[in-house]
Amino acid sequence: MAEVAQNSPAEVQAKQVVYCGVCTLPPEYCEFGGTAKKCEEWLKDNHADLYQRLYSEEALSSNLSELSVSVRERAAKDAAKKEAKAAAAEARDAERKAAAKVQIKRVERNKRKHVTVITGLEVHGLENKKVAKELGKKFATGSSVTKSPAGVEEITVQGDVSEDVQEWLLELYGKEIPESNIELVEDKKKKASG
C-alpha cells in the first residue's frame, strides 16, 4: 500500500492556448470568422511561428490539394461574402458611433436640488455600471444606473455636476467619445399651476 502512494502521477499541466487578438478565437478557427485577413495579419505580427505553421505555402497547398475545384471556389466565395459582411458591419458601427450623442442633462428636482442624468454612453462601448461607480467616487456623491421611461439605461448622479462630468468624460474617455458628441442640456421642471 505504501508503494502505491509514492508512485503518484506527475502533476498535469494545463495546455497553453493562443487566442487571436482580433476575433478572440484560437488561430486555427479564425478562417471561419468574418475577419480572416485581419486575424492573419495579427498572427503574423504577434506569433510568427504559429503563422508559419498555419499560413505557410506548404500548409496552404497541402490543405488545398485535398479539396475539389468546386469546393475551393465555394470556399473562396464564402470567405469573400463573410469579409464583405464584416466590413459593412464595421462601417455601420463606426457610423453609428460617430452620430451617437452623449447627453448630460441637469434636471431640477425641487427648489434648489438638482440631479445630473447621463445617457448614450453604451453606444461608445462604455459600461454604465462601471462609469456610474467611477462618477460616485470622483464626485463623492450618489450615482446609479436607472431605466428611463423610454427603456434606455441612464446614469443619475445627485447634484449639479454636469459641466464637471463633461470635463471628466473628455479627460478619461476622450478616445472613445469625441468632444462634439457630448451635449449639455438644462431641463427645468414645470411649475404646477394652481
Curated annotation (Swiss-Prot):
Domain SUI1 residues, every copy: 102-173
Entry annotated with the keyword Secreted: no
Presence of the UniProt keyword Ribonucleoprotein in the record: yes
Record Pfam families: DENR_N, SUI1
One annotated GO biological process: ribosome disassembly
Keywords: Cytoplasm, Ribonucleoprotein, Ribosomal protein
One Gene Ontology term, aspect cellular component: ribonucleoprotein complex
MF-aspect GO terms: mRNA binding; translation initiation factor activity
CDD domains in UniProt: DENR_C (cd11607)
Xref: PROSITE patterns: SUI1 (PS50296)
InterPro entries xrefs: DENR/SUI1_TIF (IPR050318), DENR_C (IPR046447), DENR_eukaryotes (IPR005873), DENR_N (IPR048517), SUI1 (IPR001950), SUI1_dom_sf (IPR036877)
Subunit details: Interacts with the 40S ribosomal subunit.
Family stated for the protein in its record: Belongs to the DENR family.
Entry domain remark: The SUI1 domain may be involved in RNA binding.
Protein name as it appears in the record: Translation machinery-associated protein 22
Source organism: Neosartorya fischeri (strain ATCC 1020 / DSM 3700 / CBS 544.65 / FGSC A1164 / JCM 1740 / NRRL 181 / WB 181) (Aspergillus fischerianus)
Lineage: Eukaryota, Fungi, Dikarya, Ascomycota, Pezizomycotina
